[in-house]
């Protein structure tokens, strides 16, 4: 109950407005440290999205030049898939923000509550790597969230910060 009162505005934004206020954020230290273990020079980050994994809690999907990484915050683990094993990707506006699905040869990774702009950046990065990707360019259902959500860093700021932090030793 107390968490509902503390995070009430965020829950309203997510459930009613269809916008996840935590979706466009810079990577936290724990996530950056976990992803860094799987990214080695000359590989580099192309894009990432933050959101909620289906039945698994919060997470991050990251795309590098060589692989797709899924960071699972609940278990603090990273799943890796070679980029040539990705069959297709989708980013569609769902009930709680954008839903990103990455279909690989062995399974489908799904995340909801992703930021539209970060999902768009991932879509562009996948297309540039020759992977079939679709992107639904629709905004959240409501627009009231922008009045009380506060400012968010730009997509370019998020990606630049993540690239610098993932290269740090």
What are these regions (language model features)?
Residues 48-105:
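Phosphoinositide-binding peripheral membrane targeting modules
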Residues 2-7, 118-169:
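Terminal and domain-flanking low-complexity segments
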């Amino acid at each position: 109950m107390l968490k509902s009162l503390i995070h009430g505005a965020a829950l309203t934004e997510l459930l009613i407005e269809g916008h996840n206020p935590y979706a466009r954020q810079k990577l936290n230290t724990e996530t950056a440290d976990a992803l860094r273990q799987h990214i080695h020079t000359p590989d580099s980050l192309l894009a990432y999205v933050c959101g909620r994994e289906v039945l698994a809690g919060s997470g991050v999907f990251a795309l590098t030049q060589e692989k797709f990484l899924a960071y699972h915050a609940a278990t603090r683990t990273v799943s890796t898939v070679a980029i040539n094993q990705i069959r297709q990707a989708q980013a569609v506006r769902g009930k709680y923000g954008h839903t990103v699905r990455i279909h690989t040869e062995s399974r489908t990774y799904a995340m909801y509550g992703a930021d539209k702009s970060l999902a768009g950046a991932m879509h562009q990065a996948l297309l540039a790597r020759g992977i079939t990707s679709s992107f639904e360019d629709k905004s959240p259902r409501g627009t009231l969230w922008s009045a009380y959500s506060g400012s968010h860093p730009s997509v370019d700021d998020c990606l630049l910060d993540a690239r610098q932090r993932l290269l740090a030793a």
